[in-house]
């Protein structure tokens, strides 16, 4: 599979480079520093006409706020939480207090209008990102599945808007290195990036850092205009090879005389993640007689492999190797009237995708795991007169092979009505999805009782298939009222109020990581029956545990937006209040006791209420940005059969976040050193709970960052620091084999570098 991916990439690149650029399309020089107009095929309304909260970043913002990946947007965007833990595979996303640690995300990711189908690709390094828009709240009407609470739409740099050469090299703490270079000439653009880090976390067992990482990314882009048709081909490829998973065992205190504490990272088996990702997308915009037709087509290939010491201790208990070979195809058509009426405009579209994922996820049980997880459990159910159960093997493999297919088809429409100061939006999407899974799990062992002289061979298998079909209706209604008077407009002041009601959903799926527990139960029952002992229960998990349903929500919002441009001052502020009601919320749960897997389960009902705001002020060289989010997300009805968590806080998302950044640029009258810029920022994360019961909590903490930049005629020099106060905090919590683990945040770190652009 790796060979096929590399071959495809090389052939595509060869074709890309071989394209003629003799008929060069006219290009518009872009400064890359000011606000830029989006080229998204779905943006019928401007940013100021949207009746939903939108946060926009340009290329200048990415450098100033040290935004190098989607994870760096957390906290800056109100209500958005993307904790940095595990590896690049663990792209957990929470928005407005609701999200999930695994499987389908609550916000969609679009890169140049191409939907990124698999969440394993959500954690990537920004390379020549020209603009990013984060739409908050359900975006199901236009974007469909997995956009239940928002969409991150990213646009990369194109030779259609900028011509030139860019490059940068930076070096920092933990021997971290990043270098990137790009050229945009004629119809063709090309960019490449490499990064390396020795890591920040030491594994006490090996004495080496466990989170060493290397990453490579490539992008090639070709644009062409033929008559009234624009063609845009974007090919990207990336390779990731990293360690990670610096999880620390939590030793709980007695709550009175002894406080709990974290042990160092200390595990004996390999934990790593490798990923090869290739995505080729073609955008075509055609101006026909009466309509504008846009087409977006993509082919997405993913091969990744994860090795995991699943007990994360020095004991030899059990390990997981999960590999995926995935291919997906997407197609979308969008139609808009070529000439809209004064009072009405619209857009309509159809979307479809198909995906196949071949997954192998064998779990290897080692000596300590066989004894503690299988034999001790089995012998507790065997009468003493039978003796003790023994297994011949020092280790054995529970194989799990999956063939998973998904498809989705949808049709949607949005209309925009203008009546005086009112702008009304009404939309509807019909969305259908089908999921299929074939599974084959098995294990072979030899066992005997202590009183027996010979071992008995035993084979356990668990084969079958599952399928699910869903149909979702996703309506949206919104209103925007322009309260600006003529006198306000003359003074450069704009005031708008907005309200919306919308529905969103994220897909259901299959729990592939629970099959080792199911097969353990199958083995237990099979061995016991051979001994004439019959258990009353098949165990905590069974076939019903392999499927989970889609999560849906209805969102109600009220807000306002203020802007002022006068006497060199530029002020923009917004505030939004929301109420979100969710059904079948997807929650990550762990089997009771010493289970080895994890699975997604549907909670009954939940809700989230909150207020979020943003403000930005510019005056001469001074810039101030701030954002705030206050949210209360709770279970309305959730009983897992042992405990009733109704009324408790939803875990993993803080109750509030506050972000502020101030910077000043000193312009110098010199042809050598043109300006000096300095900035500082602070992020406060509020209290969060780590589990459904709420007895484990993360206290509020503050992170401080800053940077200093010297801009010369042809290049910039910069130094930057993050977590300057050296704050100690946790980013993640989970349980394995009955033990609790945390990951702590990265320590104080610095970096410096040089960038060029000409």
Model segments located where?
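Short, acidic, small-residue-rich periplasmic hinge/interaction motif at the N-terminus
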Residues: 20-61
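Extracytoplasmic beta-strand/coil segments of soluble accessory domains associated
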Residues: 71-114
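N-terminal periplasmic accessory domains that precede
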Residues: 73, 92-97, 110, 134, ...
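Short acidic/polar hinge/loop motifs at secondary-structure boundaries
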Residues: 112-136
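Periplasmic-side early beta-strands and strand-to-turn transitions of outer-membrane beta-barrels
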Residues: 161-162, 170, 182-269, 302-315, ...
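Membrane-embedded beta-barrel scaffold of Gram-negative outer-membrane proteins
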Residues: 181, 185, 283, 287, ...
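Gram-negative outer-membrane beta-barrel transporters
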Residues: 343-347, 418-424, 432, 567-582, ...
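C-terminal beta-signal and adjacent terminal beta-strands/loops
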Residues: 505, 620, 682-691, 709-758
